[in-house]
Amino acid sequence: AYLGGRQALQGVTFHLQAGEMAFLTGHSGAGKSTLLKLICGIERPSAGKILFGGHDISRLKSREVPFLRRQIGMIFQDHHLLMDRTVYDNVAIPLIIAGASGDDIRRRVSAALDKVGLLDKAKNLPIQLSGGEQQRVGIARAVVNKPAVLLADEPTGNLDEALSEGILRLFEEFNRVGVTVLMATHDLGLISSRPYRVLSLSEGHMHGGHIGE
């Protein structure tokens, strides 16, 4: 992948174990967002391989990408909610696309909203929610399909310390039930006390892989 005529990522090699939780850090423009987009198939690499469950997903045909994305939940800093749809409708979108039945959609959307503490806001529009609540809607949408992997791109970037801590605890809860979690963040204070691996990107190169203190 290229940014401004140069490679956004160069020689990046790492392995994330199934069921692992890890953090991805680096300065603005280091390549964090690009790496997450490559993993979930939003962007394609110009060279190299990306293996998911033993399969090279960088060579998937366009029609195969949706099947990959059903196994990966993606959370964005600006959460990409549809402001003219209810909270319930926003969370239901991945299930509707996947062709789930009405009963299955109702059950799983309710479970996802309950998990993030927003079941009572299901009929609200996103504009009626706080920034932290909107981010939790984005998280519910990402996990409603029960993905094997959860990717989060600066999910606490616009939130205060208390809300950020709550979001991180949510990710830890998902991880405890077996979901693999990779969270990109520049908030080193938030993650420094967590016992998870920290992968650091700088100028498109990866460093570290150490465990937080």
Question: Which stretches of residues belong to each language-model region?
Answer:
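Conserved ABC ATPase signature
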Residues: 125-129, 133-135
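Catalytic Walker B motif of ABC-type/P-loop ATPase nucleotide-binding domains
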Residues: 150-153
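Conserved ABC transporter NBD signature motif
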Residues: 48-56
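Short coil-to-helix segment of the ABC ATPase nucleotide-binding domain corresponding to the Q-loop/switch region
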Residues: 85-92
